[in-house]
């Protein structure tokens, strides 16, 4: 379990760096409510982006992006509604992205950013 938490935290750090280098601003990390947790919340222009990060070392459980199930998507949407209620800023555009990371398949992690994933 601790190994999985460390892998997840490492993946979130990689994703945050990747998104920042792509011009996005990370405005919240690991935001929690009664519905669970959003990994990253970012701004890209006038877009507010809720980001689910999935990190894997192998494909034994499928690709990282495949781990974002319908129930996980629904939970992230509920979290987004709560976050928006608490936000002092009005966001007119919201989307949900997935950052899928494979570690250990080459010298560098493989990062796939799926915009508007769900």
UniProtKB/Swiss-Prot annotation:
It comes from the Bacteria. GO terms for molecular function: nucleic acid binding. Gene3D superfamilies: 3.40.1350.10. Disulfide bonds: none annotated. InterPro entries: Restrct_endonuc-II-like, tRNA_endonuc-like_dom_sf, UPF0102_YraN-like. Pfam families: UPF0102 (PF02021). Belongs to the UPF0102 family. HAMAP family: UPF0102. This is UPF0102 protein ROP_66030. It comes from Rhodococcus opacus (strain B4).
């Amino acid at each position: 379990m601790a190994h999985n938490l460390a892998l997840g935290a490492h993946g979130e750090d990689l994703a945050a760096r990747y998104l920042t280098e792509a011009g996005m601003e990370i405005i919240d990390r690991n935001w929690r409510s009664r519905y669970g947790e959003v990994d990253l919340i970012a701004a890209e222009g006038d877009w507010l982006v809720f980001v689910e990060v999935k990190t894997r070392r192998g494909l034994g459980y499928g690709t990282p992006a495949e781990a974002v199930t319908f129930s996980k998507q629904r939970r992230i949407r509920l979290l987004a509604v709560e976050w928006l209620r608490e936000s002092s800023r009005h966001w007119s555009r919201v989307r949900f992205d997935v950052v899928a990371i494979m570690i250990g398949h080459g010298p560098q992690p493989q990062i796939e950013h799926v915009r508007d994933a769900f």
